[in-house]
Amino acid sequence: MKHADIIQTLDLEQKCALLSGGTVFDTRALPGKGIPSITLSDGPNGVRKQAGAADHLGLNPSVPATCFPTSATVANSWDPALGEAVGEAMGEEAAAQEVSVLLGPGLNIKRSPLCGRNFEYFSEDPYLAGKMAAGYVRGIQKNGIAACPKHFAVNSQELRRMASDSIVDERTLRELYLTGFEIVVKEAKPKTIMSSYNLVNGTYANENAHLLQDILRRDWGFDGAVVTDWGGSNDHALGVKNGSTLEMPFPGDDSIRELMKAVESGKISEHDVDARLDELLELVFDTKAAVEKAPRTFDAAAHHALARRAAAQSIVLLRNEGALLPLKKGEKIAVLGDFARTPRYQGAGSSAVNSIQVDSFLDCLTESGLTNVGYAQGFDRQGKADEALKKEAVALAQNANVVLLCMGLDEIKESEGLDRMDMKLAQNQLDLLAAVAAVNPNVVVLLSAGSSLETPWLKDCKALVYGCLGGQAGAGALVDVLTGTVCPGGKLAETWANAYSDSPVKDHFAGEGRTVQYREGLYVGYRYFETAGRPVAFPFGYGLSYTTFAYKDLKAAPEGVTLTVTNTGKCAGAEVVQLYVAKPDAKVFRPAQELKGFAKVWLEVGESKTVSIPLDDKAYRYWNVATDSWEVEGGSYQLRVGASSADIRLTAEVVVLGSGAPDPYQSVDLPHYRTGEITSVPDAEFAALLGRPIPEDKIRIDRNMTLGELGHGRSPLGWLVAAVLGLLLKRSIQRGKPDLNILFQYNMPLRALAKMTNGAISMGMVDGIVMEAQGFWIIGLLRVIVEAVKNIAQNGAMEKRLKNS
C-alpha cells in the first residue's frame, strides 16, 4: 500500500467515513489526520461545477465554463488527437475551478438510437468509442487531475436505469460493451472509473466482482479508484469488498455504520476497507497537489476557438445534390427555423454546462460574406402547429436563391433520465420543409440532434448538414462549413437506419420490466445491418466532402496495412480511412465485418500520402465462452479499407495463425446468431446463447422497487405516491417539458432514498417503507419512526466524533 503510514493511524470509523462522500460533490476530509477533501464535477463536454446548492441533475446554476461539442459530435471527427485537445482544455478549466475529478467521458455503446443520453456517448462501435475516449482521458489528465470514464457497464438506456438488470451473454459483454473501456484503461490509464446504476446479469455493477475485480482490476491492471454514479450504491459493504472505492454523494452516516457492521461481522475484511482507502488517498493527494499548483484562470477565447474548430471538424455532410455547397460569396440566402435564433447546442441533465458564451447562427452569418434577405422562425420549437409562422417562412423563402433551414430535436427530446419515443423530427418542422421546398428547391437543412433520425423527408432538401450538438461555438462552425472556410470531413459514428422499425433492438429496448434482454447479442448497429443485409439511410462511417479521394496500392499483413490516398478534388480536405476485418468462412459466428483501425489524413489538392493503419491484439480475437479466454480462429481474413462501412475501396487477404480452440458453439443450436437475423430470436435460443435460463422478470417488493412501482404494492400510501408522481410526470411531458427531477424520482429505487437525502433517511427507515408496501402498514410505520429517531441520534454522535478527528 502506498499510504499505509496514514491508514494505520485511522480507526475503523474514520476509514469507513472516508469511503463515502462528504457533500454532493466533495469527498470527506479529516483535517486532523492530514487528509483534505477534493471536488468532483460533471463534465463530459465542459466543467459543471455548481456555484450554490448542488444537485446531480444539472438543475441548479453552475460556474461559467466552455461548452465544447458533445462526445457524440466529436466522435464524428474520428480524431482522437482532437478529443485529446478538447480534454486538455476541459482539464485546464477544471483545475482552474479547483476540481480534482472530471466525471467523463461517457462511452456507453449506442445500442439503440432511442437512448435519451446518446448525445453523451461516442459510438455504436467499441473500438471507435475506446480510441476517442482514450484521447479525452489523456488530455484531461495532462493537467494532473483525474478523468472518470463512465458508465461501467452495459448501461444503454435511461428508463429504470437505477433498477434495471442488463441480461447479456459473456461474449457480447466482453467484445461489445467492455472493449471500449479496456482500450481506455490500457492506453490512457484513467485515475478513476465510474460504475453504472444498473445490474449486470443479476448483480449491481457497483458490487459486481466479475466486472470490478476479475476484469477491470485483474485482467486490465486498473489500479485507480472506482466511483459510484450518484446514488448508485446498493450494498455499500459488498461494493467495497468487490472493488468499489468511493460512494457518492454524501449518503449520510448510516452508510458508515453499515460498512463498520460488515467488518465487525466478518462480511468483509478490514483489509478490503484498507485497500479501497489506499486507492482513494492516492487519488486525493495526487489530484489535490495538481489543483493547488494550477492557475486560477484560463484563456476563454482560445478555448472558444478550439470549441469552434472541434465542432467544424465534426460536422458531417450527409447530402449535397448538385454541389449546392459550399455557398458562393454574396449568395442570396434566407434563414428559417427556431434553432437559428436559439441554438440547440448541448444535451439536458447532469452534463449541461453554463456556457461562457453561445454563438448565434444569425450573428455568425453577418461576417460570412453571404447576403441574408431575412429570418423567419417558421415553427414552434416544442412541436405545436402554427400556420402563421409557416406562412411567414414560406414567403421569405421565395425571396432567396438558397434557403438555410435550421431543424432538429428540442432540448427535452434528448435528456438524461428520459429515452426518446421515436426517431422522428416534429411534424411541424417537416410540414415547413415540404412547404418551403415547394417554392424553392435549393433547401439546405442544418440539423441539430444528438443521435440518428429517420429521414424520409430527404427528397425535400438538396443538402443536409449534420452539426449534431456543436457546443457554444457550433453556430460559427456551421457557417465555416457552409462557406467552404472548412471542408467537411466528419463521418458518422453511428448508423442511421431508414426507420426505427429496422432497428435490431426495437422489440427489447428499453424493456418492459426489471430485466433488459440484450437478445441481439453482437449485432448492434452496422454489425447487424451489414450481416443481415438490411439497407440503411446512411451507413456507419459515412460522410461527404467538398473534395474527392482516391485509394490505391494496398499492402497488407496480419499486423496492419499501408496504402496511398490522393486528394483528387478541387480543395484541401481530410479523409477518414477505415479498416474493417472480416472472415467470410468463419466457423465461430461473427458479424460480417468489424472496425479494427482507422486514420485521418489531411491532403492538399493533388497531394498523395502513404497511410499506415496498424492492427492490435483486438483485430482477430473473439471471446471463447468454453475456454473463458480470448482466442483467435486461424485462417484467411479479409482486410477491407474504405470510406465507410458500405464503401469499401480496397481489399486484401492475410493468413492469421489461430490459437487452436474449438468452436464453443459447435453443439449449440443458434441459427439466428449464425446468420445475423436476430430480430426474432426465440427464448430457447437466447437461453442457449446465455448458457443459462433467462431470468424471471417480475416486480419484487423490496429495497430496489422504484417509487413508480409502489403502485404494485399493498400500501394505500404507496399507491398515492406512485399516482401523484405519475400524474406530475405525465403533465410535464404533455407540456413538452418533462421534469427531470420528477423523472429521477419516479424511476428511483427505495434504497436510493437512503443514499440521496444527505442522511435524513436511513436504510432502516427504507426497510420500514418496504414493510408498508408489503402490507404491514402499522408495523412498517412504527419501524420508520423508530429508525428515524435512532438515525438522528446516531448521526449526531458520529459527526461529533468525526469532526474531532
Question: Where are the regions a protein language model picked out?
Answer:
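Charged, amphipathic alpha-helical linkers/stalks
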Residues: 652-724
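Terminal connector regions
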Residues: 617-664
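Long, acidic serine/threonine- and proline-rich intrinsically disordered regions
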Residues: 661-662, 711-789
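Glycoside hydrolase catalytic-domain context in secreted enzymes
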Residues: 1-622, 636-641, 645, 759-760, ...
